[in-house]
From Swiss-Prot:
Keyword terms of this UniProt record: Acetylation, Activator, Disease variant, Epilepsy, Neurodegeneration, Nucleus, Transcription, Transcription regulation
GO molecular function ontology, one term from the record: ubiquitin protein ligase activity
Annotated positions of the N-acetylalanine modification: 2
Provenance organism: Homo sapiens (Human)
Protein name in the entry: Mediator of RNA polymerase II transcription subunit 11
Subcellular locations according to the entry: Nucleus
Summary of subunit composition and partner proteins: Component of the Mediator complex, which is composed of MED1, MED4, MED6, MED7, MED8, MED9, MED10, MED11, MED12, MED13, MED13L, MED14, MED15, MED16, MED17, MED18, MED19, MED20, MED21, MED22, MED23, MED24, MED25, MED26, MED27, MED29, MED30, MED31, CCNC, CDK8 and CDC2L6/CDK11. The MED12, MED13, CCNC and CDK8 subunits form a distinct module termed the CDK8 module. Mediator containing the CDK8 module is less active than Mediator lacking this module in supporting transcriptional activation.
PANTHER family reported in the protein's UniProt record: MEDIATOR OF RNA POLYMERASE II TRANSCRIPTION SUBUNIT 11
Record's disease association: Neurodegeneration with developmental delay, early respiratory failure, myoclonic seizures, and brain abnormalities: An autosomal recessive disorder characterized by congenital microcephaly, profound global developmental delay, exaggerated startle response, refractory myoclonic seizures, progressive widespread neurodegeneration, and premature death.
Similarity section: Belongs to the Mediator complex subunit 11 family.
GO CC entries: core mediator complex; mediator complex; nucleoplasm; nucleus; ubiquitin ligase complex
Amino acid sequence: MATYSLANERLRALEDIEREIGAILQNAGTVILELSKEKTNERLLDRQAAAFTASVQHVEAELSAQIRYLTQVATGQPHEGSSYSSRKDCQMALKRVDYARLKLSDVARTCEQMLEN
């Protein structure tokens, strides 16, 4: 049950980030609209620029926290979608078996030659 709670909390955090990105875009739009006017309201521009900067920093921090969490969760478990390591181990084992067969056949040949003499 705690796992679902943690997952729901993570999803809520991502939804908050999404809303914050919407606010960032809205702030940017307001600034662009204000800049397109002949006479701009400096205080409005300053407030919107400060809100934009604060929102971007908040989104960056939250996304970094989400990425750190996902990295911590993922590093403790093998990547299930990749079989490269297993295939490579199998290929190396087959090469060792072939090499052992080659050496055993050399030993057998040497033994047969010694018995013939």
